């Protein structure tokens, strides 16, 4: 509330600044500046108004002035009457008039002013009006803010409520204030009554709102987001916060930027937790075995991008080996996922599932390799050892097939047709490039159908010692085939479906080995009296010549699968 400032004369003759509190018959009640003295009544003749604003005269030597100074350290500054004795530039030598002894002081112009033209106040200098307040408005009139407009309208410097007498006290220095106050009092009280009614309603509504908020804010979630992730949590132009506020049941969301703390208030726990999922961003590290990093990333990053898209994480990065900020386990590479808690959980589920799949696949492949190795070892151990020295073996070894000089080669060479009792002698390593898996199975079946030694003895042989050709086609043609009549009986006592490995006796044998890859090797062993000329391979021409020579030599012949 604005107060009327006056100057009050003290016992030393100086004037102190004070404010009018109340007006009486012959005095006024004032309060002093900074409350250096208690509130007290001052008679009118010791009270005057301050000089008008802008009032200032030129100060010359021998002029009476007022100096703003203090008598001691306990009292505030006040205005003392003095006289100018000398002027030196901006400095003035003054002599105080209130002192018994001559007292001079040098002051500047900012502490000087001309003598106050206002005289002491009188009874007519102040006007006071009292208005009785209705009972229903007494509480309303006790508020100083309720009379702000009324005070301005009547031109008063003070409007206060006297709680003892239930009156509205109006103080003014203008006589017109009394007339205006009496004229506006009814209107003022009526407006106060309307304001009071509205204020009571607003207060009641505010109380209901506060109680509703307290009821609605029973559920509260508080969490902290890392400072470098606050931008993601807030979202572009606060999009994430707006989305969280739209969750049904959420009443308020507050953010403490200094501590990066979110406060979520809601009507139920589910709404609060759902809003939290939109705002709680974090970073999590998943360790991936180093040998599976490439398979996790995929070609052109396809697999890791699928994990990012399906999980909803913001980004994923693979930390370098020399990064000390992320703890690295030996043999693992850290994958760092950034996003909401739910999205990181989804990414962890997807990545763990994929890692388990890759580990199971590797385990199955390892088991297959172990089984293959065991089969290979079993096949090698089941083969009978050779009695010949290494120098006489030539090209015959465990892993390859060939013929020994002095033995008869197979008759089915080139493009000739094979009978049911014949088998190919092609090296497994040379045939793998052109044979399919189905060919291996067919050829394996052909080997299993090879007749035993006893069965081969029952075949009718030609006069020159060669076996009849296979029964293929109407003309029964084929290289080495017999073109004679087929009226001779043929015994059917051989086993056609035998799959057992056939091995001949030591005096002229054929060994057949089938490994786990359906590869086969044919090993032939000549008679003891067969000559061995070397361990080199023979060309087709050499084979023909050797065949002709063998046909003309008297003596035993080596028979392979019944073919000389």
Curated annotation (Swiss-Prot):
Compositionally biased region (Gly residues): 471-483
Protein name per its UniProtKB record: Fragile X messenger ribonucleoprotein 1 homolog B
Chain residue ranges for the region called RNA-binding RGG-box: 468-481
PANTHER family for the chain: FRAGILE X MENTAL RETARDATION SYNDROME-RELATED PROTEIN, FRAGILE X MESSENGER RIBONUCLEOPROTEIN 1
Region (Disordered): 377-510, 529-564
One GO cellular component, as annotated: neuron projection
Signal peptide boundaries: none
Keyword RNA-binding annotated: yes
Stretches with biased composition (Low complexity): 426-435
Pfam family, any one: Agenet
Gene that encodes the chain: fmr1-b
Agenet-like domain mapped to chain residues: 4-50, 63-115
Domain notes: The C-terminal disordered region undergoes liquid-liquid phase separation (LLPS) for the formation of a membraneless compartment that concentrates mRNAs with associated regulatory factors.
Functional summary from the UniProt entry: Multifunctional polyribosome-associated RNA-binding protein that plays a central role in neuronal development and synaptic plasticity through the regulation of alternative mRNA splicing, mRNA stability, mRNA dendritic transport and postsynaptic local protein synthesis of target mRNAs. Acts as an mRNA regulator by mediating formation of some phase-separated membraneless compartment: undergoes liquid-liquid phase separation upon binding to target mRNAs, leading to assemble mRNAs into cytoplasmic ribonucleoprotein granules that concentrate mRNAs with associated regulatory factors.
Keyword Calcium: no
GO molecular function (one): protein homodimerization activity
The species this protein was found in: Xenopus laevis (African clawed frog)
Domain KH intervals: 222-251, 285-314
GO biological processes: animal organ development; DNA repair; glutamate receptor signaling pathway; membraneless organelle assembly; miRNA-mediated post-transcriptional gene silencing; mRNA export from nucleus; mRNA processing; mRNA transport
Domain of life of the native organism: Eukaryota
Family label: Belongs to the FMR1 family.
Localization of this protein: Nucleus; Nucleus, Nucleolus; Chromosome, Centromere; Chromosome
């Amino acid at each position: 509330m604005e107060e009327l400032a006056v100057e009050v004369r003290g016992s030393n003759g100086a004037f102190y600044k004070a404010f009018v509190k109340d007006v009486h018959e012959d005095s006024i009640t004032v309060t002093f500046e900074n409350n250096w003295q208690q509130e007290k009544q001052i008679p009118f003749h010791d009270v005057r108004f301050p000089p008008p604003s802008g009032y200032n005269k030129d100060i010359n030597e021998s002029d009476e002035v007022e100096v703003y100074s203090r008598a001691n350290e306990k009292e505030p500054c006040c205005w003392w009457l003095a006289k100018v004795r000398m002027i030196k530039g901006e400095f003035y030598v003054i002599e105080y008039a209130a002192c018994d002894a001559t007292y001079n002081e040098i002051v500047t112009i900012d502490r000087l002013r001309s003598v106050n033209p206002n005289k002491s106040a009188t009874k007519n200098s102040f006007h006071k009006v009292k208005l009785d307040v209705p009972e229903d408005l007494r509480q309303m009139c006790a508020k100083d803010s309720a009379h702000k407009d009324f005070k301005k309208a009547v031109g008063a410097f003070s409007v206060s409520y006297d709680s003892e007498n239930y009156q509205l006290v109006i103080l003014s220095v203008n006589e017109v204030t009394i007339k205006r106050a009496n004229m506006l009092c009814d209107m003022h009280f009526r407006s106060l009554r309307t304001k009071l009614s509205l204020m009571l309603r607003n207060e009641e509504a505010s109380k209901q709102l506060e109680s509703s908020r307290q009821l609605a804010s029973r559920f509260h979630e508080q969490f902290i987001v890392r400072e470098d992730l606050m931008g993601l949590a807030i979202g572009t132009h606060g999009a994430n916060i707006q989305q969280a506020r739209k969750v049904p049941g959420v009443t308020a969301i507050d953010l403490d930027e200094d501590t990066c703390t979110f406060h979520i208030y809601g009507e139920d726990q589910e709404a609060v937790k759902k809003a939290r999922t939109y705002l709680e961003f974090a970073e999590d590290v998943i360790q991936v075995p180093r040998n599976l990093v490439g398979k996790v990333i995929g070609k052109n990053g396809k697999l890791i991008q699928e994990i990012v898209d399906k999980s909803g994480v913001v980004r994923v990065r693979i930390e370098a080996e020399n990064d000390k900020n992320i703890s690295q386990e030996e043999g693992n590479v850290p994958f760092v996922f950034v996003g909401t808690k739910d999205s990181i959980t989804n990414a962890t589920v997807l990545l763990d599932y994929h890692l388990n799949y890759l580990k199971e696949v590797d385990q199955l492949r390892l088991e297959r390799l172990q089984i293959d190795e065991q089969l290979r070892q079993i096949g090698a151990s089941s083969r009978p050892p050779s009695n010949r020295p290494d120098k006489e073996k030539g090209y015959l070894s465990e892993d390859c097939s060939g013929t020994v000089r002095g033995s008869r080669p197979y008759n089915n060479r080139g493009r000739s047709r094979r009978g049911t009792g014949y088998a190919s002698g092609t090296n497994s390593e040379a045939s793998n490039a052109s044979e399919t898996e189905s060919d291996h199975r067919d050829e394996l079946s052909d080997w299993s159908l090879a007749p035993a030694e006893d069965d081969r003895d029952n075949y009718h042989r030609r006069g020159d010692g060669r076996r009849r050709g296979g029964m293929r086609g109407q003309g029964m043609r084929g290289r080495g085939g017999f073109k004679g009549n087929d009226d001779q009986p043929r015994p059917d006592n051989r086993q056609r479906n035998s799959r057992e490995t056939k091995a001949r006796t030591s005096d002229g044998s054929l060994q057949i080995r089938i490994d786990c890859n359906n590869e086969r090797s044919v090993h032939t062993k000549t008679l003891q009296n067969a000559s061995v000329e070397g361990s080199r391979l023979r060309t087709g021409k050499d084979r023909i010549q050797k065949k002709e020579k063998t046909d003309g030599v008297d003596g035993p012949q080596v028979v392979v699968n019944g073919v000389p």
